[in-house]
Design a protein with these regions (language model features):
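Hydrophobic residues embedded in beta-strands of well-ordered beta-sheets
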Residues: 150-153
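Surface-exposed, non-catalytic interaction/assembly patches
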Residues: 2-7, 20, 121, 134, ...
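Polar, S/T/G-rich
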Residues: 1-141, 148, 200, 210-212
Length: 227
């Protein structure tokens, strides 16, 4: 540890000296930062996104863009996270472990290659409520949060094993006096053809363009042919 007192603790600073005669106006400086390290499982190689053997529940420090461990850092960090204000806060690391594995699974990238299902490269600069910030981060991996009895619970929208199947055989329905069904077990609704979307324009921050906001056009050819 250093005993020296820093003027800007926990801050990254860059200074650039340029010749003003070379520019008609002050140039715009863009910096691509790697960000801070966070705790990740000891059996996890963040660089290769691989997991080795069984995890014993311990952590190591590493840089990662896996949103599960970035989410955990925001919750448990005592300097700027939720734990600074709610000391008793806790979160299930074992469920986060399954979330992180799902995030790291490779999926098609639309250009003939693959990429991790979910990544997170975020620069938090605006204040917000705890619930708002955590929900925004959880949305990076299709997650939802709720708080109960000092513990933060997290669930992820992903394919899972069937818990219960429902059909007319095991659902109560209203039967009229004549024996006919007065109210069916299930009701089905649809949408108008004009309301069905076949094209989307998505705005996102493109890392190949210094994270500038770009608009991506995507269409569903199958739905276009159908509707």
């Amino acid at each position: 540890s250093l005993d020296e007192k820093f003027a800007y603790p926990n801050t990254g600073i860059i200074a650039v000296k340029i010749d003003a005669r070379q520019f008609s106006a002050p140039p715009v400086l863009s910096v691509k930062i790697r960000g801070k390290r966070v705790q990740v499982p000891t059996n996890y190689d963040a660089a290769t996104r691989t997991y080795t053997g069984l995890w014993d529940g311990t952590f190591q420090m590493a840089w990662t863009d896996n949103p599960a461990w970035i989410f955990r850092d925001i919750v448990l960090n005592e300097r700027f996270g939720v734990k600074r204000y709610v000391n008793s806060i806790a979160i299930d690391p074992w469920y986060l472990y399954t979330v992180s594995q799902y995030c790291d699974e490779l999926v098609p990238n639309g250009s003939g290659g693959t990429e991790p299902r979910f990544t997170c490269n975020v620069f938090l600069q605006n204040p917000g409520s705890v619930y708002q910030v955590l929900n925004s981060l959880a949305s990076c991996f299709r997650g939802l949060i709720y708080y109960s009895e000092g513990e933060l619970y997290l669930t992820q929208d992903r394919e899972q094993e069937v818990v219960q199947q429902f059909s007319e055989a095991n659902v109560i329905q209203d039967v009229a006096e004549d024996g006919g069904v007065s109210s069916p077990c299930f009701s089905y609704t649809g949408s108008a053809r004009a309301a069905r979307k076949t094209v989307v324009l998505a705005n996102w921050d493109d890392p190949t363009q210094v994270y500038s906001s770009v608009t991506e056009y995507q269409q569903d050819d199958e739905l276009l042919d159908k509707f």
